[in-house]
Amino acid sequence: MLRFLTLLLASSACAAAEFDCMIEARQTVEIRSSVEAVIESVKVTRGSFVAKGQVIVTLESGPERAALALAQGRAETQGDIKVSEARVGITRKKWQRAEELFKQNFISANARDEAEADFKLASEELQRARETQLLARLEAQRAAEVLALRTIRSPVNGVVVEVMRKAGEFGAITFKDPIMKLAEIDPLHVEAILPASMYGKVKRGQRAVVVPEAAIGGRYEIPVSIVDPVIDAASGTLGVRLELPNRKGAIPAGVRCRVQFL
């Protein structure tokens, strides 16, 4: 009975206690170019909400567009294949006719063999024409992929935190040059640092109430998503994370809060 009361009091103390926490972006992402190029346009500004896959930056791509058009033209050309197919059809008929004439002793074996050789040569030329077109299609695909690198898309649903480069700036950018920074804010991460004595009293999936600082307001009941399995020996603390849905982006990241575990 005494043990039960002790556990009950400990549980009540855990539920009643409040702890400081911080509301942070789920992740921040620096946008860079994978190719060296000059910025043609920046499609968003600081504070803009962006969707995953949305075009946010375009790079100058004149030569790449021309290369793609040329490769597509080669890939779509059917002239060589049609000529080769026609020649295969003609030489096949000649070879078949030569076989019949040879069986009737109207032509020599050499004449029959020449007709067969012409057919085989035409077949090989048709195969080469088809292989050439396949290579042209692969080249067109490669050119399309190279051109796609000139269009930069957002890797996340989020908000633009900072824009570092502008369209038309002198000189090409490289992968070392960040263009902009995005923050993913749905869901937000609520990070709390608890005393080590709370280990075992807060569990994954447990509900908690998060209250942002007064300037923001609101009260949100959300589950614990992570309880660090290792206690920081130097500070005697334990890290806990909760995920706060933020579909409309109404709650900013970087806000202090208080959390109470239920």
Model-identified regions with their sequence ranges:
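Sec-dependent signal peptide recognition
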Residues: M1-L8
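N-terminal beta-strand block that forms a small beta-sandwich/beta-barrel module immediately after a flexible targeting
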Residues: L8-V38, S225-I226, P252-A253, C257, ...
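Short beta-strand-turn/beta-hairpin segments enriched in glycine/proline and small hydrophobics
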Residues: E18-S34, L138-P155, M180-L182, I226-V230
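Surface-exposed patches in structured soluble domains
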Residues: M22, E40-K43, F49-V55, V146, ...
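Amphipathic alpha-helical coiled-coil/rod segments that serve as protein-protein coupling scaffolds
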Residues: A51-P155, E191
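Short, surface-exposed secondary-structure boundary micro-motifs
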Residues: V55, E60-G62, K176, E213, ...
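Structural microfeature recognizing short secondary-structure transition sites
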Residues: P187, G218-L262
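Low-complexity, intrinsically disordered
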Residues: R204-E221, G249
